[in-house]
């Protein structure tokens, strides 16, 4: 059977990690994979994470399954962190996923189940893994103008003109903050216009929230996300805890859906959980319990 296969292309970002490790020059700088490092080139474990882990080990009583949606305390804490009291929670559902990538995967599967072969619009450029995840989910990928290499800013007028021409069967993937890979971010005023455009056209906003807190702080970085989800009846958010909690190898993320009303939220969540059950079945708990412990404790937070 396997003789029909050809070698798949390697991941360019991960390949850079190997090249960096093999480079003997002392002045080298790693601009590859998005991992926080200190001045010594080490990705440290946060003190709050260590304290949370100690508490978990001391108080843990079971290793039984969590359920398809994952750690409920984690889910509630993440919704408080990301959305605050912005929305009526009866419209919101959340499911734990293995990292931000896992969140993107299950949510794109959900989109394709709702609108088979839908078009998802991504920024030019975007995180390299967005496209294969979308394509492997059955979606059609197109790009909207974004980065201006000369000014190192956003081609906002062109971006907005493209968004204004979309319709209710289109999905728009937005970087909630800290645009990867360009670092060129929308201003609050530009986010206001994007939100108004999405509300007008009915296109579905899909927000990748991988770096919350790494730009101008938690509240400032959440502005665009909150503005958009407050303006539209439906939205999706892929949250990652890898960066802001330093839990890269724990693979902890969350898939958040916002529906028109509670009844539609229940239906949509049932489909999301069905997708999860047919893929990784249930998520691991350790990273989720770390984040829950930190967010529920004022001292650790």
Named regions from a protein language model:
Residues 77, 230-301:
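Conserved core segment of the aminotransferase class I/II
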Residues 209:
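Walker B catalytic acidic pair
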Residues 32, 175, 239:
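Short beta-strand segments
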Residues 212-226, 274-281:
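Alpha-helical subdomain
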Residues 200-203, 233:
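A short helix->loop->beta-strand "cap" motif at the edges of active sites that frequently abuts
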Residues 1-66, 84, 278, 284:
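N-terminal "arm"/small-domain region of PLP-dependent enzymes with the aminotransferase-like
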Residues 54-55, 61-199, 212-214, 223, ...:
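Conserved core of the PLP fold type I
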């Amino acid at each position: 059977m396997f003789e029909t296969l050809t070698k798949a292309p390697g991941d360019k970002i991960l390949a850079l990690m190997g090249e960096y490790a093999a480079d003997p020059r002392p002045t080298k700088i790693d601009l590859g994979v998005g991992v926080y490092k200190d001045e010594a080139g080490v990705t440290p474990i946060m003190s709050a994470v260590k304290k949370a882990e100690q508490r978990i080990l001391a108080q843990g009583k079971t290793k039984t399954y969590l359920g398809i949606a994952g750690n409920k305390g984690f889910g509630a804490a993440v919704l408080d962190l990301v959305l605050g009291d912005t929305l009526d929670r009866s419209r919101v559902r959340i499911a734990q996923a293995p990292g931000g990538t896992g969140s993107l995967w299950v949510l794109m599967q959900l989109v394709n189940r709702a609108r088979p072969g839908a078009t998802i619009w991504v920024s030019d450029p975007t995180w390299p893994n967005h496209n294969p995840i979308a394509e492997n989910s059955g979606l059609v990928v197109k790009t909207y103008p974004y980065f201006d290499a000369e000014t190192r800013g956003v081609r906002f007028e062109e971006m907005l003109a493209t968004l204004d021409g979309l319709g209710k069967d289109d999905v728009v993937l937005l970087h909630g903050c800290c645009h990867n890979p360009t670092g060129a971010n929308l201003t609050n005023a530009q986010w206001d216009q994007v939100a108004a455009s999405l509300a007008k056209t009915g296109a579905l906003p899909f927000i990748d929230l991988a770096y919350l807190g790494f730009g101008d702080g938690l509240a400032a970085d959440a502005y665009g996300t909150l503005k958009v989800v407050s303006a539209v009846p439906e939205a999706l958010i892929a949250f990652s805890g890898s960066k802001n909690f330093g839990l890269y190898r724990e693979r902890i993320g969350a898939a958040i859906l916002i529906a028109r009303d509670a009844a539609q939220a229940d239906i949509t969540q049932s489909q999301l959980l069905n997708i999860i059950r047919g893929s990784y079945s249930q998520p691991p708990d350790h990273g989720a319990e770390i984040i829950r412990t930190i967010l529920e404790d004022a001292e650790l937070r």
